[in-house]
Amino acid sequence: DINWTAGATESAWNLEYGASGYTQGTGTSIALTATNYSITGLLSNTTYDVYVQADCGSDQSPWSGPHSFNTACGSITTFPHNEDFTSGNTSLNCWEVVNGGDANTWVFSTNGEAAIQYSSTAHDDYLISPKWNIQAGTSDRITFEARNESGSWAEQFDLLLSTSGTSPADFTETIATNVVPPTTNQSYTYDLAAYIGQDVHLAFHSTTTDLLVLYIDNFEIEGIPACLAPSGLVSSNLLPTSADLSWTAGATESAW
């Protein structure tokens, strides 16, 4: 809702609005007889500029503005969806940070990662994703990369899920616990098929004390592939002209 105060005794106004930075005269214009207006049909997570002008009949005042505002975030609806945490991404507006009271909390670092730095008191800090609806084969799997700055002072995190809101108490589902990434980016993949049909938020929850720095990057929401990749490839019985290989099936396949 947009509100303003009359300049004098006028009873009519012109209002114009458009996406941030638009050229006046090219926006949406509305003639009004009240000092408030509810704008509808806007895009989520978008900045808009608004101008208002008094219409005194035979004369008009200069335009007042711009007044800028940013609309709220909606659900993620396009998949696959990737967040690389690059500084300046408007999508970062849709991630929430909850600081449990310690000196440092989750930030979006200048090198394009989400990061949390050590604190002399225990973290109880949440990095919370935007909402999305989990659909089979479309948005039922997440992947992301994580790393620690130090192996000796390694931070850890829990990955939690909420099917209600974004308050810490809402994150009652545990996807992974006590995850300690190495000092080089490691990819993590989690199956969320158990939550098909539900709206969810994910949270990276840090609880460590006085360690170093943890980084999260390339958070992606995607569908579980019809044919999953094998994992755990290892070699054994290494001889001069032969080696035995073994791996774990991705699902129920019987050929490789």
Language-model-derived ranges and their functions:
Residues 7-29, 161, 252-256:
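Extracellular low-complexity, O-glycosylation-prone stalks/linkers
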Residues 14-43, 57-62, 174-182:
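Recognizes extended acidic, P/S/T-rich segments that occur
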Residues 21, 78-123, 253-255:
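Extracellular glycan-recognition surfaces and repeat-rich motifs
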Residues 1-9, 44, 59-78, 225-253:
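Pro/Thr/Ser/Gly-rich low-complexity, intrinsically disordered linker/stalk tracts
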Residues 123-126, 207-224:
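Extracellular carbohydrate recognition
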Residues 120-137, 186-189:
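Short beta-strands within extracellular/lumenal beta-sheet-rich domains
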Residues 166-196:
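Extracellular carbohydrate recognition and processing domains
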